[in-house]
Every structure is written in C-alpha cells, then in structure tokens.
C-alpha cells in the first residue's frame, strides 16, 4: 500500500475558496467511475486533503456523485456486521471487515454549505471506509489478523496477475 495512504489528513484541510477543489472533485469522480467504484478519498489519488467523492446509488445508470469536504463521522449505530470490502487502491482483493451498519456524516459541499448524510448498508459502509482513508487507515488495519495475512497474500497474487494500484492517480 502506498505510504501516502497511511498519512492522516489535517482535520479541516479543505479551504472552500480553493478553486482547484472543483477540478479535483471532477477528476476524482472520473477515476471512481472508470474503476467501477462507489467512493474515493483524496489520499487515494495522492492528495492529502480531507475530501471524498461517493456515489452508492448507480443502479439506475445515473451518476450522482456527492463531493464531501472535511467530512466527519458523527454517529455509528448498530452491532458490527462483517461484509467483504474492496478498495480501488488495493485492487484485485476483498477483505471481510466488521463495521456498524449505520453511519451519519457531517460535511461541507464545494460551496461551503454544511450538510449531513446518513445511511446504512452500502452507504453506511462507504462513508466509514472513505473517511478511514482520510485518517490514514486502510482496510488492512480494519480486518482481523488472520484475514489480513490472507489478504496480503492475495494482494501479492493480484499484483503478479496485473492489478495496478497506481491507476487511481489523477493527472496534475
């Protein structure tokens, strides 16, 4: 895993006056959709900013990305449920991770307006997974030690078979 992904982003690292954030959001959404993802955090593309793009409702073919600046999980509810998770930065594998099924997240949009989003199932899991990236936590740190060892071995096999983690970078 790229060492940049294990770095924590500063809590309020996105300045709403920064015009480059709109361009970055568009690039991140492009990378996410190109790689069939439902979420992408800025550290995954080499940018240490607290910024996430998610779209967990693509079944109807419509793209409705939500750009989240300085997101913070403000609530997690329910007994942890173990489900397989994948990650665009660690292609070719999935890992069983136990998370509470419900999450509520507070964030700002690109115009600096404060929002809250909440969800369970895929959305709740995605909110938690992507904000983990902002805190320097990958799915390897979230899984049980035996699952971690198995996942690392599978990742080596995936890399040997052609999986390329660097394909999530955005062009400057």
For the regions a language model picked out, list residue spans one by one.
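Single conserved hydrophobic/aromatic residue that forms the stacking wall/gate
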Residues: 1-10
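Acyl-group handling in specialized metabolite and lipid biosynthesis
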Residues: 11-19
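Charged, well-structured alpha/beta interaction segments
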Residues: 27-48, 53-57
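Divalent metal-coordination and catalytic microenvironments
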Residues: 32, 73, 129
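Helix-adjacent hinge/juxtasegments
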Residues: 50-91
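Post-HEXXH active-site segment of zinc metalloproteases
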Residues: 91, 124, 137-172
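Short pre-active-site segment immediately N-terminal to the catalytic Zn-binding motif
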Residues: 109-125
